[in-house]
């Protein structure tokens, strides 16, 4: 036997024989698979409750959809006692509501804390009936039913929480400008009284272009 054959035979002797099957998975492996499945289901549940799109702002860093423009309105909540609520219907300017059949694609809320802000607020947009008086009881029930995504905005030492925007996609609902009066911005002041000089809400409504001053907006 030459040297190469001797070396090969040595390797074969050292190689362990292949067994019929791998050992059964450990309990740790089984627990990991169960945990992974639970996390996957949780992610799917959370994704179903999130807005369809969550860009920083379609007004500033993302172009409007082709054929669309936007109208912005500003809401400044009044004083809200600790644990109480505030609601305001979306009221667009007359120059926009004149074209009530123009479709609305998205609504975005941007929370702008003022220097004195030191609270925690919950903010959402909901479609409400024409007869709703947006009472504290009615708004409380809408926050509790989980039917709409909610932005929780908390005081941050930097002055601006990383996530201060919430975007709703209404394109599948075929909502139009005339429907906007059926929607309301709702605010819940959770941990402290919210003063009038603590918070401003900017609501950006993306809709089909409308004639303005005799020309179409760019």
Swiss-Prot record:
Which superkingdom is the protein from? Viruses
* Keyword annotations: Acetylation, Capsid protein, Ribonucleoprotein, RNA-binding, T=3 icosahedral capsid protein, Viral nucleoprotein, Virion
Q: Per the record's keyword annotation, is Transport included, yes or no?
A: no
Which Gene3D superfamilies does the entry mention? Cucumovirus coat protein, subunit A
Annotated positions of the N-acetylmethionine modification: 1
Domain notes per entry:
The N-terminal arginine-rich stretch does not seem to be the major RNA-binding region that allows formation of an infectious ribonucleoprotein complex.
Record-stated family: Belongs to the cucumovirus capsid protein family.
Function, in words: Capsid protein. Probably binds RNA and plays a role in packaging.
Protein name, UniProt field: Capsid protein
Lineage of producing organism: Viruses, Riboviria, Orthornavirae, Kitrinoviricota, Alsuviricetes
